[in-house]
């Protein structure tokens, strides 16, 4: 699995790229994702995530995490869209997970846990979206929450 991490300059001393790679890798393994998959992770600030949220979700406000798919959304049939061919010898790019560090920090404080715990939760949430899980309907939300809970238990030792 190839996991590329970009931590924007204001947050470089606050976030470990290795930590994020480990969380993403463990989440993908637990979900039996294709080992040749690749994923991008970006840690950014409120302004950039607000711009992305406005542009792609028409919500003019910051958010905690955004996921941008490169695959079809059905977790039982993860394939690249027809207009995005993947050569047989190349990794399948799942997509990008963008996380707002300031929002993660706020949420961690409100929840009474560490920023790393919140970053892990948001990253798991974003990766699950890339794998096709969603929470717009009650049944789908229950399935996604179950996978999030399992992943958080799985990475508990990384957080300690």
Curated annotation (Swiss-Prot):
It holds the Pfam family YbeY. Binds 1 zinc ion. Its cofactor is Zn(2+). It is found in: Cytoplasm. PROSITE patterns: UPF0054. GO terms for cellular component: cytoplasm. Belongs to the endoribonuclease YbeY family. This is Endoribonuclease YbeY. The gene is ybeY.
């Amino acid at each position: 699995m190839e996991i590329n991490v970009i931590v924007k300059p204001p947050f470089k001393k606050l976030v470990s790229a290795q930590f994020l790679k480990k969380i993403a890798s463990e989440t993908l393994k637990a979900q039996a994702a294709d080992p040749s998959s690749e994923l991008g992770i970006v840690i950014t600030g409120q302004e950039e995530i607000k711009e992305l949220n406005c542009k792609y979700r028409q919500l003019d406000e910051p958010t905690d995490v955004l996921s941008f798919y490169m695959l079809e959304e059905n977790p039982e049939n993860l394939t690249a869209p027809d207009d995005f061919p993947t050569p047989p010898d190349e990794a399948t790019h799942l997509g990008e997970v963008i996380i707002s560090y300031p929002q993660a920090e706020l949420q961690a404080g409100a929840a009474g846990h560490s920023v790393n715990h919140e970053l892990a939760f948001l990253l798991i949430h974003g990766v699950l979206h890339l794998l096709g899980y969603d929470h717009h309907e009650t049944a789908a939300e229950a399935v996604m929450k179950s996978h999030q809970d399992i992943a958080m238990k799985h990475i508990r030792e990384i957080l300690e």
